[in-house]
Amino acid sequence: MTRFILPLLCVLGMATPLCRAGWELYPPEFILRGERDSLQLIATWRDSERVADGTRSARYVTDDPGIVSVSGGGKVRPRSNGVTSIRLGDSRVKITVTGIQSPDPVSFRHETLPVLSRLGCSAGSCHGSPHGKGNFRLSLRAFDPALDGLTLVREELGRRTNPIEPEKSLLLLKPTTAVTHEGGKKLDEESPEYALLRSWIAEGAALRKEEESICTGIEIHPSEARVLHFPDANQQFSVHARFSDGTS
């Protein structure tokens, strides 16, 4: 019985007797603020028989590739200030890019620590274990930013973060395996994560920005229940954080 719920809802919401097949892009519009911002698109195919995620197989078209780039997996990154659209079938996302020439300083709490968590550095099996690894300890999943700031900036005579020569920081040398790292390679020198960590170090490895906003909530899309059927049994998610200054 479950398999007929989505088609029935679609029929009730349309004036025509059958659902119109096509692509839906989410979100309908978005603002990218600064060169480090990014957006994960969600591409959904709907017809009278199924709802399927096509985020990683869809062929996106960017009206102005000079303003944004979009990967095959639906990841959008800014290139220059302006307004453009990304299209898929009849669906369209309006993208506005601002702040490329004057990026905000890297936030230790909202950018540096999340990158380290995503790389697995603060996981319980790595430096987030109770005693750390290799004389380097981070709080588990960055629950204690003050402790993490101390170990990253103050310990090891400042060798973990070197603002004068950022590339020689152990925080970059270890995960790229430029020097021996028991945990193996975690970071690519050409990746956005490497660029962010390098920028944070080059800016002086600041631990707090003045009047820094706080996260007030998150939104996960798709938010509605979905029944996925083989072979279309995968689903891409996007998570948007909302901050106290009104940005997301």
What function would you assign to each model-found segment?
Residues 20-248:
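Aromatic- and Gly/Pro-enriched helix-to-coil junctions and flexible linker segments
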Residues 5-16:
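Bacterial N-terminal signal peptides
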Residues 1-2:
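N-terminal secretory signal peptides that target proteins for export/translocation
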